[in-house]
Structures are given as C-alpha cells and as structure tokens.
Amino acid sequence: MSVRRFLSTSARALLFTAALLPSLTSGLPSGNVRILQKGMEPEDYLSSASQNEVPHDISLPKTELADPNFLVDDMPTLLGRDAAVDPSMFTSTFTVKNGNDANYITASPVSNDASMTAISTFTSGKEASYAIQASPSTFLPDSTTTSGSQVSNAVEASSTFVADTTSTSCNPATVLIVTTSGSTSTSCPPPTTILIVTVPTTTTTTTVGYPGSVTTTLTGTPSNGTVIDTVEVPTTTNYGYTTITTGYTGSTTLTTTVPHSGNETGPTTVYVETPYPTTVTTTTTVGYPGSVTTTLTGAPSNGTVIDTVEVPTTTNYGYTTVTTGYTGSTTLTTTVPHSGNETGPTTVYVETPYPTTVTTTTTVGYPGSVTTTLTGAPSNGTVIDTVEVPTTTNYGYTTVTTGYTGSTTLTTTVPHSGNETGPTTVYVETPYPTTVTTTTTVGYPGSVTTTLTGAPSNGTVIDTVEIPTTTNYGYTTITTGYTGSTTLTTTVPHSGNETGPTTVYVETPYPTTVTTTTTVGYPGSVTTTLTGAPSNGTVIDTVEVPTTTNYGYTTITTGYTGSTTLTTTVPHSGNETGPTTVYVETPYPTTVTTTTTVGYPGSVTTTLTGAPSNGTVIDTVEVPTTTNYGYTTVTTGYTGSTTLTTTVPHSGNETGPTTVYVETPYPTTVTTTTTVGYSGSVTTTLTGSGSNSIVTETVDVPTTTSVNYGYTTITTGWTGSTTLTSIVTHSGSETGPTTVYIETPSVSATTTTTTIGYSGSLTTTLTGSSGPVVTNTVEIPYGNSSYIIPTTIVTGTVTTVTTGYTGTETSTVTVIPTGTTGTTTVVIQTPTTVTATETDIVTVTTGYTGTETSTVTVTPTGTSTGTTTVVIQTPTTVTATETDIVTVTTGYTGTETSTVTVTPTGTSTGTTTVVIQTPTTVTATETDIVTVTTGYTGTETSTVTVTPTGTSTGTTTVVIQTPTTVTATETDIVTVTTGYTGTETSTVTVTPTGTSTGTTTVVIQTPTTVTATETDIVTVTTGYTGTETSTVTVTPTGTSTGTTTVVIQTPTTVTATETDIVTVTTGYTGTETSTVTVTPTGTSTGTTTVVIQTPTTVTATETDIVTVTTGYTGTETSTVTVTPTGTATGTTTVVINTPTTTGSEVLPTTGATGTAGTETQLTTATEVQPTTGATGTAGTETQVTTGTETQATTATETQATTATEVQTTTGATGTAGTETQATTATEVQPTTGATGTAGTETQVTTATEVQPTTGATGTAGTETQVTTGTETQATTATETQATTATEVQTTTGATGTAGTETQATTATEVQPTTGATGTAGTETQVTTATEVQPTTGATGTAGTETQVTTGTETQATTATETQATTATEVQTTTGATGTAGTETQVTTATEVQPTTAVTETSSSGYYTTIVSSTVVSTVVPGSTVYPVTHVTTTTGVSGESSAFTYTTSSTQYEPSTVVTTSYYTTSVYTSAPATETVSSTEAPESSTVTSNPIYQGSGTSTWSTVRQWNGSATYNYTYYTTGGFTGGNNTNVTGLYPSSAGANKPIAYLTFVSLFVYIVTLI
C-alpha cells in the first residue's frame, strides 16, 4: 500500500474537489492517527523513528479521488455508518495561499457536532511530507496549535478552510494549523493535505403546520448524513375526525390517519384496524312460567351470541338439577320448564366437561363429634360427597395421620355409636411422596425459638418447636452464601445454663445480580439511592449524601454470604455533632468493600480503591467540599469481569470538569481482579494469561498519594493465547494521561485461583502456565501488621470450574493443592453438543454442616441411560449435632426416576443430600423443532425451515412470517396446539365449509404423559371469518389410541374474501403425527381448521377425544372428526365450527318501594335473586347483580374457603359492632331489603347464586358484608395460620376485650363459625367456592347495611390465602368472645424430611478392557482329547490414551484338526477420543492344522488388525493371524503348535503363549 504523488510542483493554481465513492459502508476504527509519508509502504512506518510522532494504529483508506494520481487504500474501514454515501457530501474545500512545504498538518473542525465528511485539496503547488488521518478520539477547539494532534468530528459540507499566515520563520514548515474561513494560524504555512473524518448520521425534526386534524410524523430519507423528520401539527381546529374501526386477522391494532389535502372543512378520517375479537355475548331477560331462572344460549352469529335468561313468573315450584359429565369443553345447561299447570319441580340438566370431575355435596347429621366428608367413587364424571355434621357436641376427636402410596388424601371418621363420651377417631391417609409434618411446641431454657425436625417415619415428620422459657439472652445471626436454591436456617440452642446469645446460621443462595454503589454529595437533606438499569448483570446504584447537614456519616461495609444488601443506620441520639454510622452488609461472592467518606477540595465524588486484604477492599470516597465543577464520564469496555471507575480529581485550582473513567466488562469474558500496592504513581492493571473465558488481572495501586494523572486504555484483540498489557508510564514531569495497551486473545482461558498464606507483606497473585486451565495462586501475608491477617487459613475447600468443550463425554479433573493447605479445584468439561447415546453429567454443589468435602456420582437406576449427577458437598461453618437433609431434584434424559442418598464422607457429620433424578419428556434421538413467528410488511405468510448446518443434529427452526399492515388477500392460518393422551403428534387442517372464505385452522395435537384407558375428547373453539359454524372431529391416526380433538370454528364479525386457516395442535397417546383439514360445513365460507395431532411419550390403550370449538362468520354448525394419521392410536379431535350471532339486550329494572327510596337492580348471567325493596323513611336501596360483583364469590379469596364447603356464620351482636362477611362462588343467598330509618342497602349479586340476606334494622348499626375474589384477609396455600395437606384443625377463639379474629378456610372443608360477641368486637369472616351461606344481619341503632357480592372483592377468598387451609380438611373455629382477645393460628406444610442415606463411592482412574476368546476344536473320532488352557495378558496404552489390560483365555482340546478362536473386545476410554464413542467387535479367527497328530515345533503367531467405521459411532475391529510355528516333521503346518514335547509323538497337553499385537488406529 502506498500514497502516490498527486500534485506536481508546477501545479500552483490547481483547485479541485474530491468526491468519495457512494458505496462506502464499513465502520470507523478506533485508536490514534497515523502519519503516512509519501512513497512509504506501511511496513516502513515502524522503522523510521523520525516519523513516529504519533502512534501507528490504522491505515489510510483506499478510494479514487478526483485526481487519479492519488490513491488511498481501504477507504471502507474509515466510514462510521452503514449507508451509501452521496458524493456531494465531500465537497468541502481547503484553500492554502502560500507555497511552502510542511512536514506535518493538523486540522480542527468548525463545530463539535458537525455531520459531514470532508476531503479537501488546495491550490498550493507545494507538497506535504505527511498526511494525517484523524479518528474520533480528541476534539480540538479552533485555533489550537498542537503538533501531531488528532481531530474528531467532521466539518460542514460548505466550509472553506483557509490558512493565511505570513510567518517566514520556517520553510519548509513543520506544523500547519488549518482553521475555519477567516482564521489565522500562528505557525508556518502551508502544506498539501488530505483530511478524512466521519461521524454518525444525525436526525433533525422539523415541525410545520398543516390544515389537518391529527399530529403526524413524516420520516424523511437520509440525505448527506442527516434524516429530516417532519412533524405536521394541525393549524386549524374547525374540523374533527371520523374514526372507522374494522377488524382484521392480525394480532395488533393498526391506526391510519388520512389528513386533509388543504381545503376541506369536513372531518379527517382515521382508520383503526383491530384484531378480531372473541365472541360477544348479549343477554336478554324474559319471563316464563317455570320455577328456575334459566339461560338459553343462542347460536353465534357474526361474532355475537344472544343468551336468553328465562326468569320464573311463578314461584310455587322448585327445581331438580341433574348433573352429568360429557366429553365437551364447556358446561351445558338445559332447563325443562313447566308447560303452565304443573306444581312439581322443574328439571335442569347440567352437562359438565370431562376430565374435570363434578362434585356434589350432601349434608347429613350423624351422632359423631367431628364434621366429616365422605367422598364417593366417581360415576360418569360426578363425585357425590356426603358431609356428616355432628348432632351432638359432647365429644372431641382424635386425628391419626399416616402416609400411604396412593395419590389422594383419604379421610375416614369412626363415629360414636351413640353413647360414648370419648373422642371420635379420624384417620387421615396422605399420599407419598408428600410428607406430613406434625409440630409439637415445648418450652426450653434457651433464648431463640427453634424447630427441631425429627426423622421421617412412614411419611410423617414430627417437628419440635422449642420456645424459650427465659428472655435474658439475645441471638447472633450468621448469614452465609451457598450454591443451593433455597435458604437454609440452623439454630444452635443453649444447652440450658448459658447466658450469652444463641447462634442462628442462615445459608442463602448466591445471587445473580451484582450491585455497585457510588456515593456522591448533593445539597439535599436526605440520603437517596438512585438505582440504575441493569447492564451485563450489574446494577450501579448512586447514593446521594446530603452536604448541607451539620453531621457527616461513616459507612462501614462488610461482606456476608447472603443474597441481598443489608443497611443499618445508627442515628444520633440528639446532641452529637460527629458522623452517623451506617453499616452496609453486601453479599458474597462479590468482594467486600468498606467505604470511608472524607471531604477534599475537588469537584467530583471520587472512590479510591484500596488493596484487598482477606477478601475486603477499603474504598475511600472523597466528597467535594466545593461544588463549582462538574465532571465528564468516559465509559469504555474491557475484558474484565467488574466495572472499574477511576476519577481524576482536580489538583485544587481548576474550574473545568473532572474526568471519570468507567470501564465495563465485555459480556463474554470473566475477569478476576487482584489489587496490590506498588511504588508507582498510576493504577496499573496486569492481565494474567489464561483461556476458556476466565482471565485474572492484577491491579497495581500506587502506594503514594499523587493521583494527578489519568490514563487512557486501548484494548485490542490478537491471535495469541494470553492477554498482554503494556503501560506507558510518565517519566515524572508529565501531566497528561498514561496509556495502557491491553491485547486480549481471541479465545480466553479458565483460571482457577488458590489462596494460601505466606510470610510476605503484600497479597500477591502467581499466575500458572497457560493451557485449558490456568491456576493462579494468591499469597496472603500473615506476618505483616499493616494488613488484616486471617486468623486461620481455610483448608479443605473445593472450587468447581465447569467449562464446555467439543467432546462427547464429561471430563472431570481434580486439582489438589500442593502442601497441606489450600483449595482443591475440580475442573469439569461438559460437551457443548450432547450425544444422547451416552451419559450426561450434572454437577450440583451444596453446603452442609460437615468438615470435609464429599463428592458422590449418582448414575441413573434401572435400565435408564441419561444424566449422571455429581453431588459435591462443601462444608459450612456450622457443626451440627444432627444430620440435616437436603433434597435436590434434577431432570435427566433417562426413563426412570432415580433416587440416591448422599451421606457425608470421612468422619464428618452434617447434611445428607437426597438426589432425585426425574426423566424429562424429550427424546434426544430426533430433531427438535422451534417455531418462530414474526410480522413483516408483505402480503403472504412465508414459512422457512432452518435445519442445522454441517453434521450437527439438534433443533430445527421454522420461521413463519405473517403480514402486519396488509389486508389479507389470501388464506389466513391460525394454529391451535392442544395436548392429548396419545403417543404421536396429530395435525389436521380445518378449512371453512360451504361457500365460506376466511381463516383456516391447523389443529396440532401433542401427546401428554397420561395413559388413557378410554377415549378422551378435547374441544378447541376458534374464530374465523366464515359465515357458518364448522365442526371437525380429529381422531388419532394409525394404530394410536388416545385423545380425540373436536375442532369447532365459529364465525367472527368480518367476512373475508378468502379462506382463513386456523391450526390447532393437540397431543395424544398415539405414535404418529396426524393432520386433518377441517372445512366449514353447509354453505358457509370462512375458517378452515387444520388439526395436527402429535404423539406423547405414553402409549394409551384406547382413543381419546379432544373437542375444539371455533367461531366463524358462517350460518351453520360444522363438525369434523380428526383421527390420528399413520399407525398411531390416541386422541381423536372433534372440530366444531359454530356461527356467531348479533342480538340486542332487554334489561328490565324494578324500582324501590318506600319514602325517597331508590332501587337499582341489574341482573346478569344465570341467577335467581328475589329482592324486596326498601321500606321506611328516606331509605335508599341499591341492588345490583352482575357477573362480577363487590361481594364476589370467587374460587380464589383471602379468608377463603375454596372448593366445596358448608360455612355457617352468625353475625356480630353488641354495641358499635362491625362485621365483615364475604361470600363468593356458587352460593344460595336470598336478600331481604333494608327496613328502618335513613337506612341504605347496597346489594350486588353475581354469577349463579341464590343469596338471601336480612336487612339491617335499628340505630347506629353498621354491617358490611363484602365478598371478593382477592382480599386482605386472604387465604393462601402458604400462610401465616396455614394448614397444608390433610389435617383436622380445631381452633378456639381468644377471649378478651376489643377482640379481633381472622379466620380463613380454603379447599374442601366444612367450617361453621360462630360470630364474635363482646364490646367493640371486630370479626372478619370470608367464605368462598360452592357454598350455602345464610347470613343474619347486624342489629342496632340507625343501621346501614351494605351487601356487595363481586367476582373480585376486598375480603376475598382465594386458593392462596393468609390463614389458609389447603387440601381436604375439617376446621371448626369458634369466634372471639370477651375483651381484647387476639387469635393467631398458624400451621404450615413446609418441613424437613430426612431420608436414610445410602453411601456410594466412585473412583477415578483407568478402565480395564477385557477380551475373552474361546477356542473350539473339532475332535478326531476315536482320539484322546486333552484340555489345554491358554492365557495371554497384555497391558498397554492404546492410541486413544486409554490404559487397559488385555487378557485372552481359551481352552484347546488335543488332538484336533481345526482350532477356532473368537475374540470380542470392548474398550472404555478414560478420555474422550475426539467426538465419537468407540467400541469394537473382533471377527472370528480360525487356524487349521494340516496334519494329525501335532508334532513338536516352535514359532510365533503375529496378529494384525483393521478398524472399520460402521456409521454409528462404533468401530468394528477385525484381527488376522499371519505366520505360525515351524519344526518337527510338519514344516508346512499353520496354527497352534506345542511348545515342548517328544519328537514324533502325541502330547498330553501343550502350553501356548501367544504374542498378541493390539493395534488401534484412530480415525
């Protein structure tokens, strides 16, 4: 590469403009400028010291300028943006008036925000000795005179640069300063120059007025590096706009505004395209002569379903409900009304879907003492539960809880026969592996409440809670981190006579996010923390410390092994003037930093980082005592693992900004930093060698206090294997920044750090040799008082480093420290591409209370192959008196569940780990498929299948592009995926039936893991743009049995021009993928549904049925049955397309009766709610019934009773009493209007319910009866007074004054509750699920009753609650009575279940290859047979670095004519040979004896081998024999000969020693 002479010395008047080619697109390199001398090649740069004024980092680009004599190489490397460049951008002109030569040239841009790139030439006939290329590094203001300076930012396209100087002191000039037009330089003129600078494209926004009505942004195209966006703001307001909303088959709302052209006065049109909605239901209420309010659901038409609610006009009948199960997906209700003259009950048929189980509850009395639920066997999907309510109350009950191997909780109550007075026995059987925990509370002389967990017995763990009987001690909490996923707490109680604090050990999981805190001063009065956004796993928090208060503060930061930062502030007591102390505890493994804040005369808060000692770094935060400067932050990336911040403060008299350098880690490199002190003046980072993504850096911190220099870090990559760091330090008098060059390898290394103590005075890092693993040894001084010396050197710890590599087996190497102390490192290499034919390895590291590190390898049990788990237990700092148990559950690729109990090794006591490996559902022998759906601006749906490249196997990606803003002119496709109990994936395409066009549905059935004994049916309903309802039944294909899918397509409100397609994917228990296309039936056009059934991993014995119901714009119901394809059996899918309909609503309202009374009654859904209006003076009654209500009954609530329950609640009685009573779900609640003076009643009822309520009567009484789905007194599966699993829990309320009772019940229960009685008593009682809850209102003076029922409520009942009772339980609670009573009842299901350990050990080393051979001979009839045994043992190392012992055993019978020997070899290697699994099979080898008997001879058999690849990771080995024995009378005999015998006579036996040459040739 060279720069050619481009101006002759005689061309003094030539002025030309350089134009750059428009195809330059690459990015601008970083670094300093390069000086290029005329005629020099790039390799000459470094050899010429006189030309080395500026660092040589990048080369001049290559392009053809206007003058063809000038050529610059590699122009694309210079430009800073990826866009075509207009030649008009490079027309700036530099004019030089004088004619002297110059050795160097610099230039400064017009402004710091220039946006153009300038290439200039000039009129001078002189030549510049050098051309300087600038890069964006340093911005120079105008008229700056600096030799060899850099230039960043470009000049304006129209700028003219003029150098007009009269100095004659230098010829040729050494420096030329080129400034803007009109400026004059102070140095010698003028050279020939070329200046090339680029900056990114900028965007300019222009706001203009236009006669439209909507503010619009018009985006311009890039021109000359600038994009001009025009924002049109309406300048007139005399018109509005018209919004036209349409539906389309997309997934997002599209808005298009059509502005006025300039002279219209009408409204502007805005088109809004919204996705097709789900079906809209309109309800009409009519009267009929029946006795039950019935909802008749109309067929869908154009997206709307009109439901007719029949309200009884007579009340003299009841009704009979018959509930049955069916295979649909929605609950169907059919009411058979009276014809007009019947007096018997009306029949209501309720069909509920399988596999959901319908439970009917019947309540009967019995002479026992405990409310018991007897669950009947399911019949046709219905379970009849009988609730036995005690009719006598003189006994208690005894609960016996045991575990058994079933899957549901069994409760058996042995009632009294009638005359007993003792307790009734309730037997509760809970399933394994769920563990039942029984808690016993005892007193002990300690100071901390401690839970002692007993050993499990038959599924039950008895926990003993020790409550301190003395209160004179405190406790000390020690929190450490460990690599588990849950928090472990261990309390060491007193033995009985101590008075000191009790120790509580808390082990918390290591965190994943590192938070760095920077402290700055500000003129406020409150310390504030500003949390930054996370970047690369790091969150930078800024703590603003007030500078206007009269005290400071001292922050002491220590590390602990928790996962969150703990901050404790010790405030002043009132008269101190010294600093306040703030204790900050930050989590490990981040280095612990202690921060001290001092004032200094600078302008920026600076953190000076001290050298680390014993895991602690003391940072000094300098807070400015003056506030007149700002600061400039420069952020760069580097290859470390933490964010480094360096602040260059002022020396005391500057007024400009202070510079803060922030170096953030690159995301792909992990860097470990060690800080040591040294006698220099600049903080220096020495990067150690390493590979595999871990690099250790040593930071040299000056031990002197001169910090007046900054530094510039330049990081580049190179092809070496270690990181090289070069620091150009100052010689002593410079004030500019120091340059640090860091060259990092393209592939980094894994570094393991071992910490030991030594007798020096500085913490030193010794880096080991490079390789796959680099071991750094950190020496910590223990003999110098200037450092914090650890009291003990930790021994026996283990550090595990896991890296990926391209092999096929997991390799584990244990690096043991030398000497007797230090960390043991376990390096685990796991394959990056896993072959499913071998065993995967998962390493789980847990902490335990022993003293040694225990490692156990857990292999899968049974016949499974798959993941092997290596459990590493590392000691914690606590010595426990008993054995803890930690359970770790991992997934692996096997087919059976494997459980291994890992006990501590050696003499340690402590934690026992139970490892449970559960099979995953992925079969690794086939290719996974991932589907990615994106939107694009095309008009058709594009599908591309991306298969893995090369020889890889694995995931295939299907990319589906769907149009976004384009009206669909072709067939839309909707994919619905459902699970079913088959074994194969079934796919069916459901197209619209009849003449409908619109959406096509693809139904994909994927297998589940359940084995079905009968045919399941899954119904999938989708909408499409047709006009008729289309139903298709998708049955499993092939020989599969399992789920059948019914696909129902219902019309939407839009008529499409073509056929939409909806895809429904379901699983089933078949073995093949079944695809069926479901078209609409009848004359409808619209959605076609494609049903795809995919097999599951379970083989079902019969065909399941899945029903899919979809809506479409047709007029008929279309049904298609989709069976599985191929030989699969399993799920059959029935696709039903139902039309939508549009209707109107009839909503009658009955007014209130009384004086000034108002009644509002809205009724929605299916309900029976008779209401009596309010009667009285100034009475107001609001009665609203809606599907969602305030006193909502929800299956989820806070004092929730979930599932099926009977809960009777008696309201509060007393003075100024307040009762909160909520009812939710399906209930019977009649309501009687309020009666009285100034009474107000609000009554809202929703869902299907009958809710009678008695209004408030009296003076000053207030009753709030609210039931909501979510509430404050919530019941949750994990709760404060939580009862989980199967339990019997009786609670007696507190007695006192001002009593408060919180009582929540959930799951299937019977919970009668007696209200609170007393003075100022408050009772909160919530009931939810399917219940019968009569409520008696409050009695008092001036009563106001608000009775609200809503789907979501404040006092909600939810399946997750605070005082929650989960599962099946019997919980009787007596309300609070008396004065100041408080009741808290907590039961939890969280337990520790120890398991008897099984000790397993594994050892590393070499495997042994056993080769067995059998010699079979053909015996000559009539001859004597002598058995001869041959044993050959060979030990060696094969080409795969596998040590083995090769043994051959055979038995030979003599005399013989034919000797046949067979060999079978299996080789197991201690390290993986490349990426293949090698085994071998020897072919049979035979040798023939040509005469009989055999005579004496001698010789050696030689064997050769050939290895052949058979295409499936197995090698076939074939061995051949050559040569033989010679001697005796038969010199031509081949085969086996006796080693010694008399000449010419038979032998009784022979001894044969064979030299076997074992040759393995690797491919």
Swiss-Prot record:
Sequence repeats lie at residues 203-280, 281-358, 359-436, 437-514, 515-592, 593-670, 671-750, 751-825, 826-869, 870-913, 914-957, 958-1001, 1002-1045, 1046-1089, 1090-1133, 1134-1140, 1141-1162, 1163-1184, 1185-1200, 1201-1221, 1223-1244, 1245-1266, 1267-1282, 1283-1304, 1305-1326, 1327-1348, 1349-1364, 1365-1386, 1387-1397. It is a lipid-anchor; GPI-anchor. Glycans are attached at residues 224, 263, 302, 341, 380, 419, 458, 497, 536, 575, 614, 653, 784, 1510, 1516, 1529, 1532. The keyword Transmembrane helix does not apply. Residues 1141-1397 are annotated as: 13 X 22 AA approximate tandem repeats. Keywords: Cell membrane, Glycoprotein, GPI-anchor, Lipoprotein, Membrane, Repeat, Signal. Disruption phenotype: Abolishes adhesion and invasive growth. Residues 1135-1393 are annotated as: Disordered. Residues 1-27 form the signal peptide. Disulfide bonds: none annotated. GO terms for cellular component: external side of plasma membrane. Residues 203-825 are annotated as: 8 X 78 AA approximate tandem repeats. GO terms for molecular function: cell adhesion mediator activity. A lipid is attached at residue 1539 (GPI-anchor amidated serine). It comes from the Eukaryota. One of its GO terms (biological process) is galactose-specific flocculation. Residues 826-1140 are annotated as: 8 X 44 AA approximate tandem repeats. It is found in: Cell membrane. Residues 1540-1563 form a propeptide. Its main location: membrane. Belongs to the mam3/map4 family. Galactose-specific adhesion protein essential for non-sexual flocculation and filamentous growth. Required for adhesion and filamentous growth through recognition of galactose residues on cell surface glycoconjugates. Induces flocculation when overexpressed. This is Galactose-specific cell agglutination protein gsf2.
